[in-house]
């Protein structure tokens, strides 16, 4: 990168009314301090900084299948068949999204196509 000569630097400094090369490298004001205070976090299950293993704070280990509180279905007793299983199996028909399709009949007049 090209730099200006001493005369050009002096001319720019004189025209601007201040020293432009004084803060050339540190041109950003928002530089944080090297020593930071410890963060003020709310107390929770993982607020400890030591002896806080990942496996103890993992929420997936606490997830379980849902427990059934109440069911509208009747529970069968082990070893007994269902009371109306034979009747219910014969009454059910296949579910279709539309009314049944009519079967087309071939024409009865001569000649057959």
Swiss-Prot record:
Example GO biological process: mitochondrial electron transport, NADH to ubiquinone
Region feature (Disordered): 32-52, 80-113
Modified positions (N-acetylalanine) in chain numbering: 2
Pfam family, one: CI-B14_5a
Coiled-coil ranges per UniProt: none
Gene Ontology MF annotations: oxidoreductase activity
Primary residence: mitochondrion
Membrane topology, from the record: Peripheral membrane protein
Source superkingdom: Eukaryota
UniProt-annotated location(s): Mitochondrion inner membrane
GO cellular component: mitochondrial inner membrane; mitochondrion; respiratory chain complex I
Keyword annotations: Acetylation, Electron transport, Membrane, Mitochondrion, Mitochondrion inner membrane, Respiratory chain, Transport
N6-acetyllysine carried by residues: 40
InterPro entries: NDUA7
Summary of subunit composition and partner proteins: Complex I is composed of 45 different subunits.
Family (UniProt): Belongs to the complex I NDUFA7 subunit family.
Described purpose of this protein according to its UniProt entry: Accessory subunit of the mitochondrial membrane respiratory chain NADH dehydrogenase (Complex I), that is believed not to be involved in catalysis. Complex I functions in the transfer of electrons from NADH to the respiratory chain. The immediate electron acceptor for the enzyme is believed to be ubiquinone.
Protein name stated in the entry: NADH dehydrogenase [ubiquinone] 1 alpha subcomplex subunit 7
Species: Bos taurus
Gene expressing this chain: NDUFA7
């Amino acid at each position: 990168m090209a730099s200006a000569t001493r005369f050009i630097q002096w001319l720019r400094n004189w025209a601007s009314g201040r020293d432009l090369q004084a803060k050339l490298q540190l041109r950003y004001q928002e530089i944080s301090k090297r020593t930071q205070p410890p963060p003020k976090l709310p107390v929770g299950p993982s607020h400890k900084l030591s002896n806080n293993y990942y496996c103890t704070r993992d929420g997936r280990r606490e997830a379980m299948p849902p427990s059934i509180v109440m069911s509208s279905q009747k529970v069968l007793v082990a070893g007994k068949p269902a009371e109306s299983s034979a009747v219910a199996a014969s009454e059910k028909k296949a579910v279709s999204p539309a009314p049944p399709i009519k079967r087309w009949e071939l024409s009865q007049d001569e000649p057959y196509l």
